[in-house]
Amino acid sequence: MRLCTYSVEPGAPRLGAECGGAVLDLARYSHLHDGLRLPADMLGLIDAGPDAWRHATELCRRFSAELPTHDLAQDAEAGLAYPADRVRRHAPIVRPRKDVIGLGQNYSAHAKELKNAVPPAPIYFTKPPTAVIGTDEPIPYPQGLTTRFDWEVELGVVIGVGGRNIVQARALDHVFGYTVFNDVSARDLQFRTSQWFKGKSLDGTCPMGPVIVTADEVADPQALRLTLTVNGVRKQDGHTRDMIFSVAQIIADLSAGMTLEPGDAISTGTPEGVGDGRTPPEYLKPGDIVEAEVEQIGVLRNPVR
């Protein structure tokens, strides 16, 4: 499934699924067709567990099969489904319950471009829920706080089944789905001390989306191309096979002695091509359009304002 959080004015954000050219309201469609009501938000669906995920998948298949005979205008009037271009997309998890966990320098070429040694163990930091925004939302330029405002396209992982001391061989069984993150970073704040948190945590510096693609549709998270453009010019072009620590290794390492919970989000690091590693350096400025893309997931687009 390609799951999103959408809204239609003046309504509040709700859980949806992309089906063809439509966005299906899973909770309403489920209630109408089988008397059950799936949760109306992403975290609720994640918490509901694998049986609910399978039910949602079956609803999407049913709706997709019926779509050629549907009157989408009538569906929209009933609040069941909408043409994709009629809805606003939010971050798939509008307000994470906890900080997003980030990885630093998880691609060797990226570590080298920042003149750092390849790390012997994963480097973790976090980004607070207040940093999370969705596709097409503006990234606020922090005037007066930074002159080195940088981009980072990353594969995002959302945990579906919690656990502690998860073994690497079973780690991917704990994944709910995958998304795109842009780990926007204020480099001068990031590197003023050895602790990166402030430079990674400014409001609006964790764009996420446009969807979460469920794990059953991504055969291998280490087989995905990542790209990023600024104003249509390609800046990053990498591949998840080049991660130093794979998704499975990250989950196993993180969960060693530390419980991962459903809904936890992990941003797995960026390939080379960031602005701070260029000669001369390049940085984001107001008016720029940033598009971060991960193969099989989609394009996360944000203006800088």
Question: What function would you assign to each model-found segment?
Answer:
Residues M1-P122, E291:
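N-terminal non-catalytic cap/leader segment that marks the start of a structured domain
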Residues P13, T57, P68, Y82, ...:
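Catalytic-pocket segment enriched in acidic/His residues
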Residues S7, Q105, K127-P129, D136, ...:
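Short, structured patches in soluble enzyme cores that scaffold and shape functional sites
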Residues G102, D150-E152, E261, K285-P286:
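Residue-level recognition of short, solvent-exposed, well-ordered loop/turn junctions
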Residues I123-P142, V161-R164, G204-V211, P271-G275:
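Short catalytic-site patches enriched in acidic/histidine residues
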Residues C4, R89-P92, K112-K115, P140-F149, ...:
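A generic local secondary-structure boundary/capping motif
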Residues A17-E18, A117-T135, W151, K285-Q296:
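Structural signature of FAD isoalloxazine-binding scaffolds in flavoprotein oxidoreductases
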Residues V8-P10, E18-A22, I159-V161, V230-G232, ...:
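Short acidic-glycine loop/turn motifs at beta-strand connectors
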